[in-house]
């Protein structure tokens, strides 16, 4: 093994911009000021981080039939939608809605920067995004009520030196 890590203990933090479009280097927190739960206390998984890479074929017509096709990378990035799967209950709903309200109170084109920290890592994964309200999830009898909350990504700094908080 090469030092694999588990997902238990992941921290999900956010911080508002002081200057629109500039990633904060301090002030990251795990829950809204009026929230009860840290985000990681109700999130059970995350998706949407994997990059989709568009490519263009540049194989010349002189290539033999069984020759190797050639490609160049074009645009890359994810689909802009980060989904956090979560257990839904009144406390998690209210905690998420408090985060959404904090974002809606920002002015001047400011947004949140989010940071994902894996246990034992010296770097965090940073992206800028707007949290969307929590909607009523699909549900079935005999199952825990779970659903997704979504963050619409608008920028990404990728892996950078982590900005941790003691209480996160």
What role is predicted for each listed range?
Residues 88-91, 156-158:
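Acidic glycine-/aspartate-rich tracts in secreted/extracellular proteins
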Residues 115-162:
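Short beta-strand and beta-hairpin "edge-sheet" elements
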Residues 19-21, 31, 120-123, 166:
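Polar, enzyme-active/binding microenvironments
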Residues 93-128:
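Short, acidic/charged, Gly/Pro-enriched secondary-structure junctions
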Residues 81-83, 111-113, 146-148:
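Broad gene-expression machinery/nucleic-acid interaction feature
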Residues 95-98, 160-168:
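Short, charged, solvent-exposed linker or helix-capping segments at domain edges/interfaces
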């Amino acid at each position: 093994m090469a030092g694999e890590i588990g997902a238990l203990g992941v921290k999900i933090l956010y911080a508002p911009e002081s200057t629109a479009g500039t990633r904060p280097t301090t002030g990251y927190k795990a829950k809204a000021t009026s929230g009860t739960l840290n985000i990681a206390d109700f999130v059970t998984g995350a998706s949407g981080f994997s990059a989709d890479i568009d490519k263009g074929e540049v194989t010349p017509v002189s290539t033999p039939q069984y020759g190797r096709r050639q490609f160049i990378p074009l645009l890359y990035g994810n689909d802009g939608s980060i989904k956090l799967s979560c257990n839904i209950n009144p406390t998690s709903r209210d905690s998420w809605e408090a985060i959404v309200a904090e974002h809606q109170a920002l002015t001047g084109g400011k947004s949140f920067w989010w940071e994902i920290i894996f246990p034992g890592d010296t770097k965090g994964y940073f992206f800028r995004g707007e949290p969307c309200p929590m909607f009523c999830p699909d549900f079935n009898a005999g199952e825990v009520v779970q659903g997704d909350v979504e963050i619409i990504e608008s920028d990404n700094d990728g892996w950078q030196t982590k900005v941790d908080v003691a209480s996160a």
